């Protein structure tokens, strides 16, 4: 039976897709539909070369998936015919899902219930699942949850110091995100260090427009920076990360902001965007560091916050840290940010290898610390699609 898996990642206004061989890891098709629901809705994909098409004003997830099936896959009938199953990235699974699951009506309801904590993402996931079922009625669908990897966190890590009944009755706790990426990096480090996954202790920094740090002990997540939602933790592209909660009351009561305005500010106007008041693009911050005040300010705050998290998470690993790892768009490509963060961790005996750090960009990987460094730091390209494909193939019986 074919182990080709169609991997779907439905964002609030995007659809990322790939056809992945779960056995070899080869990607036969990759693509992205973006600006969905807007006049400029479009799709880009790679299949025998690069292609791009306009989807039509207002095209949404259903139209994007239909275009992918009827136009892109139709041009490669053998690829479509050999699809074995469909895997869906699901941002939030609440406490119900501790691992990936074959999608049933009950699982679909669980995804809907968890939408309270991911109102932009989970409803889009459900649309993607329903559209996939309609277009491929004979294929099994599997949900792979970003939150599942973090379900091993101890109570001391996931509880907030709020009235306990808020957790027991309403599920208000830390859930964490990027679990699929953190899991992939854990497995990769195990291979690089020639250790069983169950013996790996790392701190992984997944840095992109959304960013999180995860402390991984004996191959399991024991703490992570994102919380109930993806808003908590690090400075991100447009998200604020950690702030004093009373700022919300001050904005509302003293400055007259509405709840909707505050929500929009914290999620879409903060982070690098807020600190620079120019852009959320980390490349601007990196390229103009030391020359433009706004870029310098943003990069210093970003690196300070990240270094604090990494240092703090050493306390969860009980004396052994095998490696600090960097992944994600920024983690894999920004040598200056990696160096600034690691230099702030000099107390741990970390020494950056400047040449190796510069080489580890644009697909380059490897150790970026010297042989004398007490703790190695590594750059590893993440591959969430492969994890989703592997889990899907296993649960679908491919």
Swiss-Prot record:
InterPro entries: Ac/propionate_kinase, Aliphatic_acid_kin_short-chain, Aliphatic_acid_kinase_CS, ATPase_NBD. It comes from the Bacteria. GO terms for molecular function: acetate kinase activity; ATP binding; magnesium ion binding. Its EC number is 2.7.2.1. Gene3D superfamilies: 3.30.420.40. It is found in: Cytoplasm. Keywords: ATP-binding, Cytoplasm, Kinase, Magnesium, Metal-binding, Nucleotide-binding, Transferase. ATP binds at residues 16, 206-210, 281-283, 329-333. Pathway: Metabolic intermediate biosynthesis; acetyl-CoA biosynthesis; acetyl-CoA from acetate: step 1/2. Pfam families: Acetate_kinase. CDD domains: ASKHA_NBD_AcK_PK (cd24010). GO terms for biological process: acetate metabolic process; acetyl-CoA biosynthetic process. Substrate binds at residue 89. The keyword Nucleotide-binding applies. The keyword ATP-binding applies. The record marks 178, 239 as: Transition state stabilizer. It catalyses: acetate + ATP = acetyl phosphate + ADP. GO terms for cellular component: cytosol. The active site is at 146 (proton donor/acceptor). Its cofactor is Mg(2+); Mn(2+). HAMAP family: Acetate_kinase. Catalyzes the formation of acetyl phosphate from acetate and ATP. Can also catalyze the reverse reaction. Homodimer. Belongs to the acetokinase family. This is Acetate kinase 1. It comes from Aliivibrio fischeri (strain ATCC 700601 / ES114). The lineage of its organism: Bacteria, Pseudomonadati, Pseudomonadota, Gammaproteobacteria, Vibrionales.
């Amino acid at each position: 039976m074919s182990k080709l898996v169609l991997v779907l990642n439905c964002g609030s206004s995007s659809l990322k897709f790939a056809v992945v061989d779960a056995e070899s890891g080869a990607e036969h098709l990759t693509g992205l539909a973006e600006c969905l629901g807007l006049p400029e809705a479009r799709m880009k994909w790679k299949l025998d070369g690069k292609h791009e098409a306009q989807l039509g004003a207002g095209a949404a997830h259903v139209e994007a998936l239909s275009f992918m099936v009827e136009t892109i896959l139709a041009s490669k009938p053998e690829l479509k015919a050999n699809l074995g199953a469909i895997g869906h990235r699901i941002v939030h699974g609440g406490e119900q899902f501790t691992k990936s699951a074959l999608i049933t009506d009950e699982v679909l309801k669980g995804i809907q219930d968890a939408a309270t904590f991911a109102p932009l993402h989970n409803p889009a996931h459900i649309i993607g699942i329903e559209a996939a079922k309609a277009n491929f009625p004979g294929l099994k669908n599997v949900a792979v949850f970003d939150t599942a990897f973090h379900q091993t966190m101890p109570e001391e890590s996931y509880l907030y110091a709020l009235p306990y009944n808020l957790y027991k009755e309403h599920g208000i706790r830390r859930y964490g995100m990027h679990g699929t990426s953190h899991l992939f990096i854990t497995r990769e480090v195990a291979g690089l260090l020639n250790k069983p996954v169950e013996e790996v202790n790392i701190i992984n920094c997944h840095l992109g427009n959304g960013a999180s740090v995860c402390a991984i002990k004996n191959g399991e997540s024991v703490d992570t920076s994102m919380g109930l939602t993806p808003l908590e933790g690090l400075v991100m592209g447009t998200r604020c990360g950690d702030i004093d909660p009373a700022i919300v009351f001050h904005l509302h009561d003293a400055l007259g902001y509405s709840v909707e305005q505050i929500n929009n500010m914290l999620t879409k106007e903060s982070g690098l965007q807020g600190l620079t008041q120019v852009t959320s693009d980390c490349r601007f911050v990196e390229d103009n560091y030391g020359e433009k005040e706004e870029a310098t300010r943003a990069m210093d705050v970003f690196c300070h916050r990240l270094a604090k998290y990494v240092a703090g998470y050493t306390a969860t690993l009980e004396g052994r840290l095998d490696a600090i790892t960097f992944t994600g768009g920024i983690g894999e490509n920004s040598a200056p940010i990696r160096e600034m963060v690691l230099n702030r961790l000099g107390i741990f005996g970390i020494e950056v290898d400047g040449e190796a750090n510069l080489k580890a960009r644009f697909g380059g990987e490897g150790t970026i610390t010297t042989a004398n460094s007490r703790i190695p730091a590594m750059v590893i390209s993440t591959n969430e699609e492969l994890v989703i494909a592997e889990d899907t193939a296993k649960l679908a019986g491919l």
